[in-house]
UniProtKB/Swiss-Prot annotation:
GO BP, one annotated term: nitrogen fixation
UniProt cross-references to Pfam families, sorted A to Z: Oxidored_nitro (PF00148)
Sequence positions that bind [7Fe-Mo-9S-C-homocitryl] cluster: 42
Name of the encoding gene: nifN
Annotated keywords: Metal-binding, Nitrogen fixation
GO MF: metal ion binding; nitrogenase activity
Pathway linked to the protein: Cofactor biosynthesis; Fe-Mo cofactor biosynthesis
Protein name: Nitrogenase iron-molybdenum cofactor biosynthesis protein NifN
Family recorded in the similarity comment: Belongs to the NifD/NifK/NifE/NifN family.
Role according to the record: This protein may play a role in the biosynthesis of the prosthetic group of nitrogenase (FeMo cofactor).
Amino acid sequence: MPSASLLKAAAVNALKMSQVGRGLCLPGMNRYMPVMHGAQGCTSFGLVLLVRDFREAIPLQTTAMNEVSSTLGGMENIAKAVLNIRLRAKRDLIAICSTGLTETKGDDVNAYLRLTAEAPRPGRYLTGLCPHALTTGASQDGWAKALEALAGRWESRGRADARQADNLLAGCHLTPADIEEMRDIVQSFGLEPIVLPDVSSWLDGHLPDNFSPTSMGGTTLAEMRALGASIVCIANRRTEAPPTAQAVQELCGVPYVVFDRLTGLQANDRFLAYLEYVSGQPIPARYRRQRSQLQDAMLGWPLLLRPGVKVAIGAEPEPVAVTLRHGWPRWAAELGGCRDHHDLAGARWRSPQPGWWIGANLEAPGTKGARARACAGSCWLTHSHGGQAAERLHIPFHRAGLPPCSTGLGAGHCLSVGYRGTRGLIFEIGQPVAGRGPCTYPG
C-alpha cells in the first residue's frame, strides 16, 4: 500500500479523452457522421489525435459555436450543420455530440433536434443526441455514451429471421485487428456476427476505390436493425458495452453475456467453450494448435525474467481496473507467478522462485507519485502519450491503451485477443521486461 505522502491531489499534463472515444465509436457505423456541438477547438483536438494515431481520414464535423451563438443558443448552428451534411455528404445517420461548452451553457439539444426534424428536409436520415461533457470522463465513457445513443435509434424490435447470428459489442480498447480476430473466431463456429460498432472495416488500412467524405465501412442500418434477430449478445468490458446489451435484451429479448477480457489462456478457453455451447459446433482444430503454441510461449516466460522485475501500468480507469482485477493477476498466475497482494492502490505478484517479483502500480502516468515509482520499474505499460515521461525517466515502455501509437505505424494492426494475440503480447512485453532484445525508448 503506498504511503500517504505519495498520494497527491494533482494531475500533470491532464488530457481529456471523452470526445476521442465518441469520435472513434460513431464512425464505426456505415454512412454515419458525428457532429461536435461546440467550438471548433473541441473537434480539432480529438480529430488530431485520431488522425495522427491511425493515419486514416476520420469523419468528424462541428457546429462551430462562437461567442454570439454560445450566448444566444446553438439551434441555428445545428440546423445548418445537419442540412449541409445531408446535402454534401448524403449520410443516413447524423449524431449530435454535446461538448463541455454546450453542456455548461445548458443548450436543450433534444428540443433543437425535434424542431430540426419537423422542418422540411431533403431525403431521409436519422439524427440522434450523444450527451456527455468533455470536461468529465475518459474515452471509455464517451464510447459507452455513443453506444447508448445508438441503442435509442432502432426502428425494428422484432426477430427478422431464424439465422444463427450473434451480436458483438466491442469496447474502445479493441483495435481493428482485435475486432477482425473476434469476427473470424465467431464465424469459425458457423455463426454470423454483427459487430457494433465495426471500426475494423474502415480503420484496417485498406485503399478504397473511390473517395468517401465519411467512414469507409462500418455497421449498416440494416445490420443494426437485425440485432434483435440474433440468438445471443456478446459484450466486451463491463462498463462500456453492457448498457447497450441490456437495451437489446429489453427491446428484443436477446440474452447477453459479458467477457471482461479476451487476453490470456483461461479467458480464451471460456470464450471458445461458450461459442461451442451456443453454436453446437466443435472447436476448430486450428485453435487447439494456437492454444498449444501459447502454452509453449508461456513456459518460456519465467525462464527469461530476471530477479527484481517491476512493471508499471498507466491507463484509463476501466482498462486499469479490468487489467488489475481480471487481467494481469490471472495472466501472471498463468505465466508462473502467484498473486501476493492486490488492492485499488496497486498490485503485486510474487514468483514461486525466491528473489524476484512482478508489480503494477495503479496511478495515472501524469502524476508525480507514479513517476517516482516508475523510476524503479523495468517496463512501463501505457498509451503513447506516456512516452514523454518515459523518455525523461529513461524507461522502456510498451504502448497500450488509447491513443495507441502516435509515434509509430500500424496502430490498427496490433493484436492482443485470442490465443494468437496473447502469444504476441507475451513476446512484445517480454522483450523489454526480460532485458533481452530491443529495449525501445521513445523519441
